[in-house]
Amino acid sequence: RKNKGIDILMEAVAKIKQQLNGWKIVIAGIESDYTVVELNEMAIRLNISDMVDVVGGLFGDDKWDAYCSSDVFVLPTLNENFGIVIAESYLCGTPVITTKGAPWSMIEKYNCGWWIDRTVDELTYAIIDFVHTPIEKRRLMGLRGRQLVKERFASDIVAKQIVELYNSII
């Protein structure tokens, strides 16, 4: 969808195409504001079609395989209520680049990715920083992301928070 920022991602990739030699950008998700054809046309127009693979929606094991086999998950979103895809990515130990449209400021505290302003330039800098981050440090970022999700969003923790909220209201 347009609020997911796929256009911003593609523009950022186009700006630094030479620095991303050997990298593949996989765009997954159900069609909404953009169709697979429109995304492929955008990649052609930006001269990045050789490094962009638009796969459409992924479900079940295919979705989890994509998260777990990715080096980084990028979501330059306009706004998210939560951003379940960020949590899912972290559960696979994959670091995240997302924008401040997602309520994930704790990314900075946990040092498990990049939480940036939603601009092409900011995304460009974050991608470059990611590419230049040593593999072991990226792996540790992903593990810290997994720890973040387990500490903040495990079902028993969320249930306790709901009970506390309920008790504070009555």
Give the ranges of each region predicted by the language model.
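Nucleotide-activated donor-binding/catalytic signature segment of Leloir-type glycosyltransferases, i.e.
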Residues: 37-58
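Aromatic "clamp/platform" in nucleotide-sugar-dependent glycosyltransferases that forms part
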Residues: 78
